[in-house]
Design a protein with these regions (language model features):
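N-terminal periplasmic accessory domains that precede
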Residues: 1, 17-21, 33, 46-72, ...
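Gram-negative outer-membrane beta-barrel transporters
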Residues: 276, 331-333, 346, 444-453, ...
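Transmembrane beta-barrel wall of Gram-negative outer-membrane proteins
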Residues: 81-108, 118-184, 211-213, 275-276, ...
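Signature of Gram-negative outer-membrane beta-barrel scaffolds
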Residues: 279-385, 397
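Surface-exposed extracellular loop regions of Gram-negative outer-membrane beta-barrel proteins
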Residues: 10, 181-183, 239-243, 297-298, ...
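Flexible loop and strand-edge segments within Gram-negative outer membrane beta-barrel domains
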Residues: 150-156, 166, 170-228, 239-261, ...
Length: 632
């Protein structure tokens, strides 16, 4: 979610996604992370949680302001990623109208990985070669410094403009426009693959420019009526473009696939107080997606083109999700109850103009409906303690990526499956939070445990066609995979955090999260389950100086805990899996007057080599970070 608009669209993939980088972090006001199924409020896909990005709003001129113009400039350099980021935003304020404009440009270069291989695998993750195309010939070149991951750099521009209209004392309107576009981005995990002849499998494997355009109008009012006390309505249009460019080593044929997605959305939410201690929230939501997927092959010798199989149905595809929902909040003494229900109707269809695979039909049309609900209980024994119990259901209706995708990764070919049904989650969560003040020490902790049953869970599994698990496609044999509804999945875990503040200027914070997931009957591990991870932070402020020491860590993820197929990127892991790692970062900041803050950081202090779980690229090694923030 971003500013009340769903980012999930018809071609969102399950698992590891990069779409969040299209939201400019320099213009964020907050980021809400909601754990557990949240289908009542957010609908399909909110099966495990919700991330809601909220960008800054323009500010109106008030009586204490001396100027109607204000702004901020930020710049940052990072040595390990060769990053140079620049951001500027400025606010124009009036009594009833205000505008906020933001511009961010980020450029990244080659990435230096850590050299301290505490995991013991001396060659794991090294970038040993790269390819050069010259005079219509590919050449495999040895990397003179295999710790430098060449060619992974990219640049990106993010633009945001929001205009706020104060309609009256109780109502306002915000027009929100956001645009993000990147350069080409290399897939190093594909470019480092070798064939049986020890030659590169690909000479080119790029994501093309990733574009996201959002335009929305948000109206809110607190003018009471019989039906509501507060109303918020958001109407939006999004345009998303993704593309992929691939060429095999020593081939003159470059494959290009382009996906264009348009999304129309509306969400109307109303709130009505009932008496002094209860409130009713209700509303409706509609999202309509269209997908135009095209692919062509470019002959580099004569620049001729020909049509090839597209990633998604080449005759077009769409999804339609209308829903109604309501929740009731009751507060009485030390107890708070929240119950909700949502009904969603889902429709997905696609057309294959030419049967790209013999066993495919001409298309598909799926119609489903889902009923989900939640019941949460909050108990406050005193002012500093909260205990909560949450029972909820969630669902995820198959989208076009689940139903109609054809793509190659490693030695696997994923084929469409139009027989999928929605997967459902039944969740139980129990948690407690506590705050304690003792003289000059403030202590707080929170802990949450969860247990989720997934029914008809969608997983990628092997498939046989005409009695064979292999298929000849694109001049090669591949193992066949397809998204399928499997048995019941069990996901459970525990998360917690502790914060301690000493003498108001020394603060310690720690958090930890553990998750496991398996299919109930076969005991096969589920995909995309991260290992144990956490962080330790120590922050000290002295006058205008701020010192930070940060420790991030991950436990190991061994091979036998990987999901089926290649979803957890087993080819990018070490022989044992993904080793555990920990890194220490340090940072010091200096506040010069009120308008200028300078920061200097040393990240990955001990130059540790590691990969985050399922990553196709090694993380940056020791790096120097310098930044400056100027307010005006």
């Amino acid at each position: 979610m971003v500013d009340g608009v769903r980012m999930n669209n018809a071609i969102y993939r399950g698992g590891h996604l990069q779409n969040s980088i299209t939201v400019d972090p320099f213009i964020l006001e907050s980021c809400d992370v909601i754990f557990g199924p949240s289908a009542v409020s957010y609908g399909s896909d909110a099966i495990g949680g919700v991330i809601h990005y909220k960008t800054k709003d323009p500010t109106l001129l008030n009586t204490n302001d001396t100027s109607s113009f204000s702004g901020l400039y930020f710049t940052r350099f990072n040595s390990a990623t060769n990053e140079l980021s620049n951001h500027i935003n400025f606010n124009l304020s009036g009594k009833n109208v205000a505008s906020l404009t933001s511009i961010t440009y980020k450029k990244f270069g080659d990435v230096s990985m850590g050299k301290n291989r505490v995991h013991g695998f001396q060659n794991w993750g090294l970038h040993n070669f790269y390819t050069v195309f010259n005079n219509f010939q590919d050449t495999m070149i040895a990397n003179s410094n295999p710790s430098i991951q060449r060619g992974v750099g990219f640049n990106q521009i993010d633009l945001t403009n929001k205009i706020l209209f104060k309609l009256n004392a109780t109502s306002k309107l915000i027009i929100n426009s956001q645009f993000s576009s990147s350069s080409n981005l290399q897939r190093l995990d594909q470019l480092n693959n070798l064939t049986l002849n020890n030659l590169p499998e690909y000479s080119q494997w790029n994501y093309g420019p990733q574009k996201r355009l959002l335009n929305s109008i948000a109206f809110s009012s607190s003018l009471s009526s019989i039906l509501f006390d507060d109303i918020r309505a958001v109407f939006s249009h999004q345009y998303i473009q993704e593309s992929r460019i691939t060429r095999r080593f020593n081939s003159f044929f470059q494959k290009n696939s382009v996906e264009n997605v348009n999304v129309l959305g509306s969400n109307i939410q109303l709130s009505k107080s009932i008496g002094s201690n209860s409130k009713l929230d209700y509303g409706t939501e509609i999202y309509y997606n269209t997908v135009d997927s095209r692919a062509y092959q470019l002959n580099l010798l004569d620049s001729s083109t020909s049509f090839i199989d597209s990633r998604y149905p080449n005759g077009g595809s769409n999804t339609f999700f209308p829903a109604i929902y309501a929740s009731y909040n009751l507060k009485k003494n030390r107890l708070s109850l929240i119950g909700g229900i949502r009904y969603t109707w889902s429709h997905a269809s696609g057309i294959f103009n030419d049967n790209i695979l013999d066993f495919l039909s001409d298309g598909f049309e799926i119609k489903r409906h889902s009923l989900s609900g939640s019941l949460s209980t909050y108990f406050y024994p005193n002012e500093t303690t909260k205990i909560f119990l949450d029972l909820s259901t969630g669902f995820r209706a198959p989208n076009i990526d689940d139903l109609g995708k054809v793509f190659i990764k490693d030695q696997f070919l994923t084929v469409p499956n139009s027989q999928l049904v929605p997967e459902y989650a039944y969740n139980f969560s129990l948690g407690i939070s506590k705050k304690i003040d003792f003289k000059n020490i403030q202590f707080s902790f929170s802990s949450t445990s969860f247990f989720t049953i997934l029914d008809n869970v969608i997983t990628k599994q092997s498939l046989e066609i005409n009695g064979s698990s292999l298929i000849y496609y694109d001049s090669n044999y591949y193992e066949i995979l397809a998204n399928q509804n499997s048995e019941i999945g069990i996901v459970y875990g525990l998360s917690g955090s502790v914060s301690i503040t000493f003498l108001k200027n020394l603060r310690f914070h720690s958090s930890l999260c553990y998750t496991r997931g398996t299919l109930k009957y076969t005991q096969v591990p589920m995909s995309h389950i991260p290992p144990l991870f956490g962080k330790l932070n120590l922050n000290y402020t002295f006058k205008k100086l701020e010192f930070q020491i940060l420790n991030n860590f991950n436990a190991e993820k061994i091979n036998k805990l990987f999901g089926q197929g290649n979803t957890d990127n087993p080819l990018e892991a070490s022989p044992m899996g993904y080793p555990s790692w920990w890194v220490i970062n340090t940072q010091v900041g200096y506040q010069y007057k009120e308008s200028l803050k300078l920061s200097l950081g040393l990240y990955n202090l001990f130059d540790v080599h590691y990969k985050t779980f399922a990553s196709g690229i090694s993380a940056p090694g020791r790096s120097l970070m310098v930044s400056a923030k100027l307010s005006f």
